[in-house]
Regions:
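Catalytic domains of carbohydrate-active enzymes, especially glycoside hydrolases
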Residues: 3, 28-58, 196-203, 270-278
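Hydrophobic faces of well-ordered beta-strands that scaffold small-molecule active sites
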Residues: 5-12, 50-52, 93-97, 137, ...
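Acidic-and-aromatic substrate-binding clefts and catalytic sites of carbohydrate-active enzymes
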Residues: 16, 25-34, 42, 54-61, ...
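Aromatic-lined substrate-binding rim segments of carbohydrate-active enzymes
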Residues: 32-101, 154-175, 218-232
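An active-site-proximal structural segment forming one wall of the substrate-binding cleft
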Residues: 38-41, 45, 73-89, 108-138, ...
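Substrate-binding cleft of secreted/luminal carbohydrate-active enzymes
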Residues: 49-51, 207-212, 233-314
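Active-site groove signature of glycoside hydrolases
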Residues: 98-105, 122-153, 278-279
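Aromatic- and acid-rich polysaccharide-binding/catalytic face
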Residues: 134-143, 147, 188-217, 283
């Protein structure tokens, strides 16, 4: 069997309105059964992980919370629907501890005491509501900042602070980050030292091919360098976050469409020798079975689903 994608990011609503053109309207009408069907579809492709990117967006929560009002969507508790179905499917779920500030300002969010306090309060509530689920595997910190040569001091402080909170309230849960700026990493001794002092279990670097910061032929060498650095640091496991999309027009300012599968196949092959796990961004909106009762995305998402399902049979 071909090396596949081990998991996927998962969103209740895409944060960038232009990018989510083809699936936000569908997601906004989803019932609990629609969310459950999406989890079953992901499980059918043998994926092991779901990363719920955001548990709040635009000052609204996707669960009953004292932090923000409940989002105005048909499903009153999509987090419960996802976790409960994941329990049945044997999928491991990471819950995002954002966005409890403006998602466009991660530099503010990781340094603002007010935003961090809100996220910690939400984490307490998420733990109280959902810790009984066997599928609740860990936490994802979505306020990512760009790696410029190495992780910034502010970002490292933020990650370690969040991880300390996770250890306190859910000592059995794992932690995940998925930084960008992967093509800018300088994996020298300073980078290795930073990795060694970063308290996180998994780092899923964005391959940045969909956003055109990295060309397909470059990603293998980048991940080879990162693997050597991670091995020397001896702490966080190296994962890959591969982008399954292309843009309809301008990068970041137009709709996301499913990428050509030949490109995605190369992306998988490039990182597979180095990454312990491969997470795709993302199943939601970019892949749909033809007969899905919970279709969300462009019609071309059917073809990407078909091609990927066939690839898994090789």
């Amino acid at each position: 069997m071909s090396r596949g994608i081990d998991g996927t990011f998962f969103e209740i609503h895409h944060h960038n309105t232009a990018e989510g053109k083809y699936w936000n309207p569908a997601l906004d009408s989803f019932t609990a059964e629609n969310w459950r069907e999406k989890v079953r579809e992901i499980a059918a492709l043998k994926m092991e992980y779901i990363v719920v990117m955001a548990t709040a967006l635009y000052d609204r929560c996707y669960f009953e919370s004292s932090v923000f009002p409940l989002a105005d969507i048909p499903c009153a508790d999509p987090i419960e629907a996802v976790l409960d179905e994941a329990d049945k499917c044997g999928i491991k779920v990471f819950l995002g501890n954002g966005f409890y500030g403006d998602w466009t300002k991660p530099g503010v969010n990781i340094t603002s005491g007010e935003v961090i306090d809100r996220s910690f309060k939400a984490m307490d509530e998420l733990t109280e509501k959902y810790a009984h689920h066997s599928s609740f595997y860990g936490w994802y910190f979505p306020d990512e900042t760009c790696i410029i040569l190495r992780f910034s001091g502010d970002f490292m402080k933020y990650v370690n602070l969040c991880s300390a909170r996770c250890h306190e309230i859910t000592p059995d849960k794992k932690t995940l980050i998925a930084p960008y700026g992967t093509n800018l990493t300088l994996t020298n001794s300073k980078y290795i030292d930073a990795l060694a002092s970063l308290d996180v279990d998994f780092i899923a670097y964005q391959d940045e091919i969909g956003v055109k910061k990295t060309r397909v032929w470059q990603s293998e060498r980048i991940f080879e360098r990162l693997k050597k650095a991670h091995d020397k640091a001896g702490r966080a496991a190296l994962w890959a976050d591969i982008e399954l999309f292309k843009f309809e027009g301008m990068v970041y300012k137009s709709a996301l469409l499913p990428a050509d599968f030949k490109r995605i196949e190369r992306q998988i092959a490039n990182v597979a020798p180095y990454a312990d796990k491969i997470i795709g961004y993302q199943y939601i909106g970019l892949m749909n079975p033809e007969d899905s009762g919970s279709f969300a995305g462009h019609e071309s998402s059917v073809e990407l689903y078909r091609q990927y399902a066939e690839y898994l049979k090789k």
